[in-house]
């Protein structure tokens, strides 16, 4: 049974138990954050509180509505059905059958997806202290600064953003930027 489910746009972390053992997997969805149309997938910034069954108890889990809410709930429902009363091998076998639908990595690679990359494989922006700083830096780096600076009703990839703080916040969530010693850094996946 799934005991905990944390989700953002990129990852769904599953803590799975078969009443004897405890497992943890990360199912990574496939997106290219460097593409402009990546940001069109945002719908709103309202969180969804999901009830996930945990040993006959309901555990409320907050999931930000970056994907279609029905899609998120379908994932939770199906994963609960798969995990309930299944062994680890059965769970992984069923999950592998669903990996195309969920855009997940293949089941044998789930454990590998949980492993951290080498410490040297990271990039750091040392002069960014806030989400707004990060948003400005990333927009400038990607040549998109002018699109964020103008307020327009045009259908652009930044139509949902009204300030650099919101853009930086979502870049941080989506791209797994971490704040450490006053600066932002992230793992760089080769």
What spans do the regions from the language model cover?
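Short, extreme N-terminal segment that most often corresponds to the first beta-strand
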Residues: 1-33, 37, 182-190
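Short, flexible coil/linker segments at or flanking structured domains
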Residues: 2, 13-15, 86, 150-155
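Acidic, proline/glycine-rich low-complexity IDRs
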Residues: 4-7, 133-190
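Phenylalanine-focused residue identity feature
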Residues: 16, 38-43, 73, 91, ...
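Mixed-charge (acidic/basic) macromolecular-recognition segments
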Residues: 22, 31-152
């Amino acid at each position: 049974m799934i005991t905990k489910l944390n989700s953002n746009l990129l990852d769904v972390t599953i803590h799975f138990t078969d009443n004897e053992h405890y497992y943890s997997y990360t199912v990574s969805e496939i997106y290219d954050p460097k593409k402009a149309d990546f940001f069109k997938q945002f719908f709103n910034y309202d969180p969804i509180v999901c009830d996930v069954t945990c040993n006959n108890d309901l555990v409320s889990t907050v999931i930000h509505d970056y994907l279609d809410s029905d899609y998120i709930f379908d994932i939770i429902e199906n994963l609960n059905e798969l995990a309930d009363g299944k062994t680890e091998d059965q769970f992984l076998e069923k999950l592998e059958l669903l990996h195309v639908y969920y855009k997940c990595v293949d089941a044998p690679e789930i454990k590998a997806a949980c492993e951290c990359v080498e410490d040297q494989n990271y990039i750091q922006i040392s002069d960014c202290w806030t989400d707004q700083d990060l948003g400005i830096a990333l927009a400038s780096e990607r040549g998109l600064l002018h699109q964020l600076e103008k307020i327009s009703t045009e259908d652009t990839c930044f139509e949902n953003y009204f300030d650099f703080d919101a853009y930086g916040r979502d870049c941080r969530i989506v791209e797994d930027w971490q704040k450490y010693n006053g600066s932002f850094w992230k793992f760089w996946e080769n």
